[in-house]
């Protein structure tokens, strides 16, 4: 299974990039296959509408490291860029990502609405596999092209579904984080070119002062859970931004730290 879990859990975003193709794992320390049954969050409200007008153009660079038995192995660099862009003639945002220095280079380009960050169009690559998706209010239409050929699909999409790592981070930064905050979410998974939504939960685990580089920062530690999979993100309390994240994988702990 060629895994594109970036955001949503590779490159430290649980949601959005799971399987394209057949049973072959990524070689860069990606998330394990999602085979266990996923448990829906109990009766908590979804995270609701975020104010996309609060987003600003920005660029972030994260160093990726795999930690196993106290040994750290660099996995390359993940770059995220947010810019103003039009999708179908409608003003919006482009959340573009690239991962370099790893065994398999990957890219994501996600166009979202300016008002609430709902997805409009998504283009992604992992090595020679390509994904293209267009979204309506409650549906997705797209195609996957790989060495195995081309497959198209159409599927229902829950409102507020999360896709890429960059989208997950931007949404979490715009949430009203506080002690005890919990909200339900949906992660969109592509398995053998068939989209399916996974129930997930976003929760503030604790407040913590953490060091990023040479600077100590006051952060919320936010967990994103879908069944047996968990990602933690450190979000600064002032001028919120994701400065660190971690995820347990089959190969060790995958760390992502803002440079």
What are these model-derived regions, one by one?
Residues 25-139, 144-146, 180-259:
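Acidic, serine/threonine-rich low-complexity disordered tracts
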Residues 7-17:
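Bacterial N-terminal signal peptides
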Residues 18-23:
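Boundary at the C-terminal end of the N-terminal hydrophobic targeting segment
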Residues 1-6:
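Positively charged n-region of N-terminal signal peptides that target proteins for export
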Residues 147-181:
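Surface-exposed beta-loop interaction hotspot
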């Amino acid at each position: 299974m060629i895994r594109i879990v970036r955001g949503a859990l590779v490159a430290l975003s649980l949601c959005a990039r799971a399987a394209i193709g057949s049973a072959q794992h990524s070689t860069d320390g990606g998330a394990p296959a999602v085979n266990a049954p996923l448990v829906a969050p109990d009766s908590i409200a979804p995270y609701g509408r975020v104010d996309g007008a609060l987003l600003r153009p920005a660029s972030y660079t994260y160093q990726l490291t795999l930690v196993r038995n106290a040994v750290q192995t660099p996995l390359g660099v993940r770059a995220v860029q947010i810019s103003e862009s039009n999708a179908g003639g409608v003003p919006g945002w482009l959340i573009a990502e690239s991962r370099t220095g790893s065994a398999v280079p990957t890219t994501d380009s996600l166009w979202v609405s300016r008002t609430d960050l709902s997805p409009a169009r998504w283009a992604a690559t992992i090595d020679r596999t390509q994904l293209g998706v267009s979204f309506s209010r409650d549906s997705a239409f797209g195609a996957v092209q790989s060495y195995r050929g081309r497959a198209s699909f159409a599927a229902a999409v829950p409102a507020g579904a999360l896709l890429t790592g960059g989208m997950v981070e931007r949404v979490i930064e715009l949430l009203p984080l506080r002690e005890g905050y919990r909200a339900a979410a949906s992660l969109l998974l592509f398995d053998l070119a068939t989209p399916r939504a996974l129930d997930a939960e976003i929760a503030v685990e604790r407040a913590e002062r953490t060091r990023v580089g040479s600077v100590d920062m006051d952060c919320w530690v936010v967990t994103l859970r879908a069944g047996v999979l968990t990602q933690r993100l450190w979000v600064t309390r002032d001028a919120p931004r994701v400065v660190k994240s971690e995820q347990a994988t089959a190969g060790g702990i995958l760390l992502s730290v803002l440079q």
